[in-house]
Amino acid sequence: MVLLSEIPGGSNGDDPNMNPQELPEELIESIVAPIPRCYYPSLSLLSRAFRHVITSQQLFVTRSGLGFKEPVLYAFIGCTPYTTPRWFILRRSNIPLQLRRLNSLPHMFPGAAVVTIGYKIYVMGGYNYQPVSTVIIIDCRFHTWHYLQDMQRARYHATPGVIDGRIYVIGGRKKQDADWVEVFDVTTESWETVPTQCPNEASENGLFVTYAVMQGRILGVFLLTNQDKVYGSHWELYVS
């Protein structure tokens, strides 16, 4: 709870008609920083000054410094071929739980590879009548997005993983040693291939169904078919 009291002798202390938009932004920031983010859309309607503070990067820095962190789940949901995948957010609000679509983010390609670093979500590749190499970065603070440099190869249902601050993307294309793995440097925002050997067990299209990152290793699971039977196998990349 935030308590406000009149400060006598101030420039507006004797003015009972002072509007919220006349409050200093530093004061507004101190007011809204401890308040849960679910109330920010309503608070942003109070005035232009409130809206400016709530959408500023400084408020995120202030909240982080004060230890106000709220767990938020982002869901990438779609039903191919009927609907293209969209981003949804599940968060606690003034009602217990609410799943809300993020209309500020564009449609995503089915089969895209997704990783998170800090407050940024990286969406790589997918399928748009054919595999694509598109890379999108989402800023979870403001739910804005922009394109990054494309991957060197188009990939669909690839296995991604973050190790030591670098993004590895594995498979998702016709298997060949030359470009089975590539890595993205988030500092220079550039891609390069990683010399490796394709697993003999992988399917020709190199599609993975799930993956995990554990102790410096990226493990991808793919399905294989043999005489009308489907079974699972896995392949791992160890990054030293």
Curated annotation (Swiss-Prot):
Residues 1-20 are annotated as: Disordered. The keyword Repeat applies. Residues 17-63 form the F-box domain. Kelch repeats lie at residues 120-165, 167-212. Keywords: Kelch repeat, Repeat. It holds the Pfam family F-box. This is Putative F-box/kelch-repeat protein At2g29860.
